[in-house]
Regions:
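A metal-dependent hydrolase metal-coordination microenvironment
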Residues: 39-195, 323, 329-388
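Acidic, metal/ion-coordinating pockets
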Residues: 1-3, 360
Length: 432
């Protein structure tokens, strides 16, 4: 058991080769019968797993191992503003023999479109939308990395301004954040990873715990001094000093009700939506809009009650289709059945590819999304295999990408296209 625990720890080691070595040793323990997979009763998939290259408790190696041992049939990496963890993710997937797909999540500027004044799917800022670049062909990763690098730099400039704002809010209480010493070390910036608001809040969480300890003193400070609203369930978790996920629960509370006080609007760090669509077309990747939907109760505890796209879905789908998006990604566990039925209906009306996007970035989230067992989501399982098939085909020849001009000429019906690429995903050698 000590060996197992040591190997699990090594999955998040600073050194990439150590992480991958741990995957190999753990898989050997599995094949020898010393480790069992979690039993599952369905072919579960997930295409939206964050790693330490944006924000997550999991390195790419650990994310793959968690996906494998949890019983996922496929796993997809989706980091914010970074493809730095992609090659490790692919290699780890090949070690444990799990099908993988790779992508990048980006915030885009919607100025000049009919959505520019809307609160779209971004809790912090109107006119800025979260979008996903799915199924990046492996030969296009370097181009994608070059594209996003200047935006990472601009984000760093804004991050420093937000750290200054935080210090102005908490400095009187003996707390001071240093961007270089406190924030960057909890990121993978040194290896091409992005630095996000979550990294800043994680660093702040460490400072708060160091200053006030865990439990009632800290809860009292948050409520009485910072005037942060904490829902009863999260207050109970933060009152428990033995809570193993304390840092992440504290981060969730801060993200829900503190960010708006120090937030600096994003501008230069967000490529224009036209640039993003152009990148997807040039690289043979799939441009997907990330549906959030109006939030009543946040599943992850990091979003307050807030309205997003649901009041203007006609306009939204008209505009994303006009702009060149080919897909919509959504999370079955995060929305109501009524919301999801509407989204599926709109995707069908506009012939948009539907992708499962269960956002994994905290240790409380399960890799298995039980909601996928509902018959209404059968298409998402097929879509995951189609994504994998697209990636395999496009990695050998961009003309073979799922939405290339050649594929557009070949397929009229979207379901025929999905079925074709699904067969490629499940049978790697028999395509085209």
């Amino acid at each position: 058991m000590n060996e197992l625990n040591e190997l699990i720890e090594q999955l998040n080691d600073y050194d990439k080769s150590t992480r991958l070595s741990a995957v190999k040793k753990l898989y050997r323990l599995y094949t020898d019968g010393n480790i069992k997979k979690q039993p599952v009763d369905y072919e579960y998939v997930n295409n939206h797993i964050h790693t330490t290259y944006s924000f997550s408790p999991y390195s790419p190696s650990k994310a793959v191992w968690m996906a494998f041992i949890s019983g996922l049939s496929t796993a997809g990496i989706m980091d914010h503003d970074s493809v730095g963890g992609v090659n490790e993710f692919i290699e780890a997937g090949s070690i444990v023999n799990i099908a993988t797909t790779v992508g990048m999540e980006v915030r885009v500027d919607m100025s000049g479109t009919r959505l520019e004044a809307k609160r779209i799917n971004n809790p912090d800022q109107a006119g800025i939308a979260y979008v996903a670049m799915h199924g990046i062909p492996h030969g296009q990763l370097e181009k994608t990395s070059r594209f996003i690098k200047p935006y990472q730099h601009e984000r760093g400039r804004r991050n420093k301004l937000m750290v200054e704002n935080i210090n102005a809010l908490v400095g009187d209480y003996g707390i001071k954040l240093d961007y270089e010493k406190d924030v960057l070390p909890v990121s993978m910036f040194h290896d091409g990873g992005s630095v996000t608001e979550r990294h800043i809040l994680y660093a702040l969480s460490k400072k708060l715990i160091s200053r006030f300890g865990k439990g009632k003193n800290l809860v009292g400070f948050l409520k009485d001094r910072l005037r942060i609203q904490i829902i009863p369930g999260l207050e109970q978790l933060l009152s428990d000093e033995r809570n193993p996920y304390y840092y992440y629960d504290l981060l969730g509370v801060l993200k829900s009700d503190f960010v708006e006080r120090f937030y600096v609007p994003a501008d230069k760090e967000c490529p224009h939506v036209i640039e993003f669509i152009g990148l997807c077309q040039e690289t043979g990747s799939i441009a997907a809009y990330a549906y959030l939907g109006d939030v009543d109760v946040s599943v992850t505890g990091d979003k307050k009650k807030q309205k997003f796209e649901d009041d203007y879905l006609d306009l939204l789908f008209e505009e994303i289709t006009r702009l060149g998006f080919k897909a919509v990604t959504y999370a079955p566990s995060r929305n109501t059945k009524e919301q999801l039925l509407r989204i599926k209906e709109y995707c069908g009306k506009y012939s948009l590819f539907q992708i499962s996007g269960e956002d994994i970035n905290t240790p409380r989230q399960e890799f298995i999304c039980k909601a996928l067992k509902d018959d209404m989501f059968e298409n998402l399982k097929d879509a995951a295999w189609a994504l994998i098939g697209h990636e395999k085909a496009a990695s050998s020849d961009l003309d073979k990408a799922m939405f290339s001009p050649a594929s557009d000429a070949k397929f009229v019906d979207l379901n025929d296209r999905i079925g074709y690429y699904k067969s490629i995903g499940k049978n790697a050698l028999s395509y085209m």
